[in-house]
């Protein structure tokens, strides 16, 4: 599943509305999601992307996480703006333990 390809990004098929991502109300904390995404290996391009709201140049590329593909730039927007992640991706993250507190363990 692809997500986060907002209109204005330099990727083929970038046709999603940024504002749609404001509707996601996720139960996993942003800190946990950001930490997980930062742990992924990114495929970066040499061409920059232009930040949709400030016009500054930012890195461009792609993240591939299981069955999910999203632009490298998504992390910038997720970390800096009030948006969420699709519920399908959130469910996947939960299934691999992201944001799931470990209950007391036996020694």
Question: What spans do the regions from the language model cover?
Answer:
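Alpha-helical interaction/linker modules in multidomain eukaryotic proteins
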Residues: 1-107
């Amino acid at each position: 599943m692809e997500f986060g390809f907002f209109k204005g990004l330099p990727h083929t098929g970038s046709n999603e509305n940024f504002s749609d991502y404001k509707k996601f109300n996720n139960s996993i904390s942003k800190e946990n999601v950001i930490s997980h995404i930062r742990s992924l290996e990114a495929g970066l391009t040499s061409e920059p992307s232009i930040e949709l709201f400030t016009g500054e140049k930012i890195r461009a590329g792609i993240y591939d996480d299981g069955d999910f593909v999203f632009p490298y730039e998504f992390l910038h927007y997720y970390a800096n703006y009030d948006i969420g992640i699709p519920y399908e991706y959130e469910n996947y993250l939960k299934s691999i333990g992201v944001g799931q507190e470990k209950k007391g363990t036996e020694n």
